[in-house]
Amino acid sequence: MKRFVPRLALTAALLAGVFTGAPNLAFAGNLPAAIDGSVAIMHTNDIHGSYKYSYNESKGTGTVGFDGLAVLYSAQGNAPDLLLDAGDTFHGQSFATMSEGKSIAELMDTFYADGYDATTPGNHDWSYGADKLRTMTGSSTTSTPFAMLCANAKSTSGVWSSSITKTLNRTWEDSESHSTFAYQIKVGVVGAMDESLGSSLRADLVAGTSFSSAADAINAEAEQLRKEGCDVVVCIAHTLDAKTFATRLRGVDALIAGHEHINLNEKVTGADGKTIHVVEAGSAFAEVGLLSVPYEYDTKGTESTDDDTVAVYAGKSDEKLYTAKDVNVLLTDPNKGSTYQSILDEVHDNKIKPLDDAFSAASSEVLGTSSTNYFYGENASGTHGWEMVRTTDFRPSKEGDTTKAQTIGHVICGSYLDLTGADLAIENAGGIRGGIAAGDVTAGNVIAISPYGNTVETWTMTGEDFLAALEHSLQISDECNHSYELQQAYVAAGHTEQEAQDKYKWRNDSGSVLSFGGINVTIDWTQPESKRIVSATLTKDGTALDPAKDYTVATNNYIITNTTDFPTFANATKHTEWSTCESAIRALIGQNGWENKMASLAGTISFGSAAVDPTPTPAPTPEPSPKTDATTTKVITKKTTGKLAATGDRTLAVIGACLIGGIVIIILGIIWKRRR
């Protein structure tokens, strides 16, 4: 078990006598029997590569970032004792992925003060491979890097750290004599990742790495930390259900969690019957948490610290959440705002900007070339791209060209298929934000297409469930198309586009329109919902999509969870997490002949009428037409056509009426006779 040297440990020999259990010779006041204090822990989780401060004053939302974190850190009356992170940190935004997480690691280590103390891996952090993740602290430019903790991971290529300890030096001052009494609080931090998350990782990325029970590993490490004299034990864990997970822990005072992307602040009873404070601070650096864990230091009424004990009261601990709005309040404070602004500027200019410049240079790299336009909208500037990926990309163009429907969607889906080897692929319209123009394609162009840091995942679902999702997507697109046509007409009448959109609003779920790949599809827009896809064949082998068969579907990790718009997604089973969507596109475009490969994988959309039943084989012999001496009259009825018979032959109508009248008279006569 690797132990890290505690950050901020006092090494000066001047203080050696004070912090080794020797009497406080300088203390001459009235020492209380117990001293109250607290351990302050600032924490983040699931930042997914977000890294710099931004704030939208009109919306009151934004990103804290490392520069905003420095402001919050400095604004505390006393500096936080620990700065911890609960995973999914190094992967997501292109700023992080293009450097394989190293840019984030450098900021964590050097952004302000002593940087972070420790983090634990999230499931997305393994995207660069287990060895690169385990040695991520090697990107540090300081002698005291943050620790990467995963107590339940074992690798054949190296040792994972389980925990760190940190000694906090405290003083108590007598209010009358002003004499001070010095003592120490020892804190242990253990980290782990829920073992169930390990099963969804790509096998090649975690080759030689195994995951044992996270709860068992934490409990064993917590016990060891207590034996080593830790007064407070904090766990950082990336886990599916933090509150349930906490009920399995022993010897832990606080659980700082990640993965659920929620704001969590709950007191839970652990397996040992003691209270554990469970916290989580949202995602994407939108929030930062500050957890205060109170303790009582029992002096035993003597100046010697040899027999002193510490009681931790997790049940009375307190959690605060800070956002970009709180950073803005500090920056605009009439008294201290300029001080905080200088801190923000210093971190941005000296730490973030050099990495931003390197990222910009990398974004200019040419990945490949394109022989044609795969626009997001009408042109390379993306005019009406937001609208078109929801509407006209799924309809024949005005020029009658039916071969370029959902072109940018096909590029994206083709990249997912190439990366994963899946049968089918989907991407939602809301996840597409750019296109490709003919010519050189840069890394920056690709980032503009998929800027959100979403991850490619593979799932299994039946052909029936997949088709049901596509059919509902077409219905959403159809209604969006109706709104768009009304908007265009309104603009043509002299109104602004904003006025048109206000009058003819989009569906709230318009972003759920699905681009798809892996199939050649024929759509008949004259048909009602659920009957518009009249044929679908796989590009892999040309076979028809079988409703009863299971297929592997590649998708981004966002849309597959939308079981409100697509209830059949709830039946799907998750298999593997891959790289970011943006890196999948980069990998495809970097290949020679990528366009032909993409086209063969993604398939086509064509438009036509509903398929008719094929002629049975062998064909039945038609019955001979009746022969008459005169021209045969074909009587057309509502039963055979759904319409009333045409009324042009008056003679025929009169004769028919007479015959019917005679028959009625005869029947009535028979009935009357029988009644008599």
Where are these regions (language model features)?
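C-terminal membrane-anchoring or membrane-association module
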Residues: 657-676
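Sec-dependent signal peptide cleavage junction
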Residues: 19-35, 642-652, 671-674
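Bacterial N-terminal signal peptides
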Residues: 11-21
